[in-house]
């Protein structure tokens, strides 16, 4: 059985929005979300440090699981709950420093080979994507679909997992039915006509996660 080397997270992280601003972090924590990621791309550390500090403070205020995407040095410096890394970041990141700081680690994967690479790092959770076509970011691979997602879940057994990529309110129940621990969403909330209603409906489906 695979086991994380990094600090553990609940198998069910619940609804897991991925957003690009502190304003969204605050809105969603106020709305009841308890697992969330700040993903700001392609800026220097000094440009995003204030946002990272503010996001981490909000996470603490709401006793939430706040992951910082990519900016691992800032996450360590300001003691975030966790860090999320893409495959391309694994080789250039000091994983031992993240581990020594006591931060949780999530890693993105897109196929079996990348799952193997992620498992070698023994992160706190493994993200599996993209499940469906997505407009949120350019993807180098084809969508996995539900059947492939289910196969990955079967392989990983009790390892905490997060499904991501094109997951809408309508698709969320079928994604969770694969046995995946959590669902990450982006546009299902941020581009919804009524983000509060969308968040409430997704929370009703996915929950807030286990303690």
Curated annotation (Swiss-Prot):
<feature type="binding site">
    <location>
        <position position="70"/>
    </location>
    <ligand>
        <name>Mg(2+)</name>
    </ligand>
</feature>
<dbReference type="GO" id="GO:0000287">
    <property type="term" value="F:magnesium ion binding"/>
</dbReference>
<dbReference type="GO" id="GO:0009229">
    <property type="term" value="P:thiamine diphosphate biosynthetic process"/>
</dbReference>
<dbReference type="InterPro" id="IPR036206">
    <property type="entry name" value="ThiamineP_synth_sf"/>
</dbReference>
<comment type="function">
    <text>Condenses 4-methyl-5-(beta-hydroxyethyl)thiazole monophosphate (THZ-P) and 2-methyl-4-amino-5-hydroxymethyl pyrimidine pyrophosphate (HMP-PP) to form thiamine monophosphate (TMP).</text>
</comment>
<keyword id="KW-0479">Metal-binding</keyword>
<keyword id="KW-0784">Thiamine biosynthesis</keyword>
<feature type="binding site">
    <location>
        <begin position="186"/>
        <end position="187"/>
    </location>
    <ligand>
        <name>2-[(2R,5Z)-2-carboxy-4-methylthiazol-5(2H)-ylidene]ethyl phosphate</name>
    </ligand>
</feature>
<dbReference type="InterPro" id="IPR034291">
    <property type="entry name" value="TMP_synthase"/>
</dbReference>
<dbReference type="GO" id="GO:0004789">
    <property type="term" value="F:thiamine-phosphate diphosphorylase activity"/>
</dbReference>
<dbReference type="InterPro" id="IPR013785">
    <property type="entry name" value="Aldolase_TIM"/>
</dbReference>
<feature type="binding site">
    <location>
        <position position="108"/>
    </location>
    <ligand>
        <name>4-amino-2-methyl-5-(diphosphooxymethyl)pyrimidine</name>
    </ligand>
</feature>
<feature type="binding site">
    <location>
        <begin position="37"/>
        <end position="41"/>
    </location>
    <ligand>
        <name>4-amino-2-methyl-5-(diphosphooxymethyl)pyrimidine</name>
    </ligand>
</feature>
<comment type="similarity">
    <text>Belongs to the thiamine-phosphate synthase family.</text>
</comment>
<comment type="pathway">
    <text>Cofactor biosynthesis; thiamine diphosphate biosynthesis; thiamine phosphate from 4-amino-2-methyl-5-diphosphomethylpyrimidine and 4-methyl-5-(2-phosphoethyl)-thiazole: step 1/1.</text>
</comment>
<dbReference type="GO" id="GO:0005737">
    <property type="term" value="C:cytoplasm"/>
</dbReference>
<feature type="binding site">
    <location>
        <begin position="134"/>
        <end position="136"/>
    </location>
    <ligand>
        <name>2-[(2R,5Z)-2-carboxy-4-methylthiazol-5(2H)-ylidene]ethyl phosphate</name>
    </ligand>
</feature>
<feature type="binding site">
    <location>
        <position position="69"/>
    </location>
    <ligand>
        <name>4-amino-2-methyl-5-(diphosphooxymethyl)pyrimidine</name>
    </ligand>
</feature>
<keyword id="KW-0460">Magnesium</keyword>
<feature type="binding site">
    <location>
        <position position="89"/>
    </location>
    <ligand>
        <name>Mg(2+)</name>
    </ligand>
</feature>
<dbReference type="InterPro" id="IPR022998">
    <property type="entry name" value="ThiamineP_synth_TenI"/>
</dbReference>
<feature type="binding site">
    <location>
        <position position="137"/>
    </location>
    <ligand>
        <name>4-amino-2-methyl-5-(diphosphooxymethyl)pyrimidine</name>
    </ligand>
</feature>
<keyword id="KW-0808">Transferase</keyword>
<dbReference type="GO" id="GO:0009228">
    <property type="term" value="P:thiamine biosynthetic process"/>
</dbReference>
<dbReference type="Pfam" id="PF02581">
    <property type="entry name" value="TMP-TENI"/>
</dbReference>
<protein>
    <recommendedName>
        <fullName>Thiamine-phosphate synthase</fullName>
        <ecNumber>2.5.1.3</ecNumber>
    </recommendedName>
</protein>
<feature type="binding site">
    <location>
        <position position="166"/>
    </location>
    <ligand>
        <name>2-[(2R,5Z)-2-carboxy-4-methylthiazol-5(2H)-ylidene]ethyl phosphate</name>
    </ligand>
</feature>
